[in-house]
């Protein structure tokens, strides 16, 4: 459905992404900022177009949908009338295009974000993954452990994880948690919880009803409790499920790589959450980002603060008073919003619900 429109917008996204990367190479901050916003807008419009449940026969069919602006409507009109976008053209020389593709490589390395890629380019003249490996070998540049692991698994880690595989991993993770303590529970959040068919990584929350606050969680021995999180990470490592650590913050957070049976290596994050923060943490880590942003804005308008730890009311002295939020629905209602199920939140990201 709408395949021609989606095809042209996919090509436009690639072109603007190339322009964005080129502005980084040229160290043109003004162009970089402009292209970053252009890219974000096109990505949003493309996501909405891919999730429409009707055929567009007139550009005005999508008028009024959040995320679809006048520029998008104009482009759709052009595609419907001519079959293509005239914005699309070869903007760079073969040499420049090769350089841009090298930077795209860098940003595909786990641990390298936009700012790090820009630093590698501007300060060290690194233009590709091969350049980076050589620079590390010769001692020209030093990088973090997470980037070293990203290079180790570059081309090996696959990010499109089928839902069926995550469901099997969820059963394994839950089973291993219950072996440590029957009340130790896990929830896989992110796009998986929103019902998507594939996910980029595995985002796990863990909780125990007796560990209500960070005090019990970080210092379990003081409350006659077991160090559940550390025991859990050790157990998954011994079983060969966790194969490499990016970071391990005892009693709190693990980031690393996992492998389930004969499936490819995957990225996984496991966070231990205080039980009193379970609802806001589930809300935050389920996403999508657009909804989180809207809800934080709604909280701010009500002189509240919303984050993954809770919903707080600020008193006249500036102190943050936590509100009673036993469920995600409590948070929606406290902000004057209708409750959205995790599946509805995925529709929110595509513009079908707002």
Curated annotation (Swiss-Prot):
SMART domains: POLXc. Its EC number is 2.7.7.7. Its main location: virion. The keyword Transcription regulation does not apply. Keywords: DNA damage, DNA repair, DNA replication, DNA synthesis, DNA-binding, DNA-directed DNA polymerase, Lyase, Nucleotidyltransferase, Transferase, Virion. It is found in: Virion. One of its GO terms (biological process) is DNA replication. It catalyses: DNA(n) + a 2'-deoxyribonucleoside 5'-triphosphate = DNA(n+1) + diphosphate. It is an enzyme of class 2 (transferase). Pfam families: DNA_pol_B_palm, DNA_pol_B_thumb, DNA_pol_lambd_f, HHH_8. It comes from the Viruses. One of its GO terms (molecular function) is DNA binding. GO terms for cellular component: virion component. Repair polymerase. PANTHER family: DNA POLYMERASE LAMBDA, DNA POLYMERASE TYPE-X FAMILY MEMBER. Belongs to the DNA polymerase type-X family. This is Probable DNA polymerase family X. The lineage of its organism: Viruses, Varidnaviria, Bamfordvirae, Nucleocytoviricota, Megaviricetes.
């Amino acid at each position: 459905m709408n395949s021609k429109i989606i095809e042209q917008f996919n090509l436009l996204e690639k072109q603007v992404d190339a322009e964005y990367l080129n502005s980084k190479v040229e160290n043109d901050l003004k162009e970089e900022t402009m292209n970053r916003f252009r890219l974000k807008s096109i990505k949003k419009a493309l996501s909405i177009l891919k999730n429409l449940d009707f055929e567009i026969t007139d550009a005005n069919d999508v008028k009024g949908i959040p995320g679809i602006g006048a520029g998008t409507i104009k482009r759709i009109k052009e595609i419907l009338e001519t079959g293509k976008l005239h914005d699309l053209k070869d903007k760079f020389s073969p040499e420049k295009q090769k350089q841009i593709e090298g930077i795209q490589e860098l940003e595909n390395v786990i641990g390298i974000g936009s700012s790090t890629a820009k630093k590698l380019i501007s300060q060290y003249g690194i233009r590709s993954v091969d350049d980076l490996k050589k620079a590390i070998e010769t001692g020209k540049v030093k990088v973090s452990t997470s980037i070293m692991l990203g290079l180790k698994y570059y081309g090996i880690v696959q990010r499109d994880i089928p839902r069926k595989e995550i469901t099997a991993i969820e059963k394994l993770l839950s089973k291993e948690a219950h072996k440590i303590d029957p009340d130790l529970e896990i929830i896989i959040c992110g796009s998986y919880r929103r019902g998507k068919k594939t996910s980029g990584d595995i985002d796990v929350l863990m909780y125990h009803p007796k560990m209500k606050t960070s005090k019990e969680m970080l210092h379990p021995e003081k409350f006659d409790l077991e160090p559940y999180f550390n025991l859990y990470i050790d157990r998954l490592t011994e079983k060969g499920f966790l194969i490499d650590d990016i970071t391990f913050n005892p009693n709190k957070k693990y980031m690393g790589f996992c492998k389930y049976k004969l499936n490819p290596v995957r990225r996984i994050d496991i966070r231990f959450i205080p039980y009193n923060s379970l609802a806001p943490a589930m809300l935050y880590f389920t996403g999508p980002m657009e909804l989180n942003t809207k809800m934080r804005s709604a909280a701010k308008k009500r002189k509240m603060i919303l984050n993954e730890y809770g919903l707080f009311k600020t008193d006249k002295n500036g102190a943050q008073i936590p509100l009673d939020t036993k469920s995600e629905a409590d948070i929606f209602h406290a902000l004057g919003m209708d409750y959205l199920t995790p599946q509805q939140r995925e529709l929110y990201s595509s513009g079908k619900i707002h």
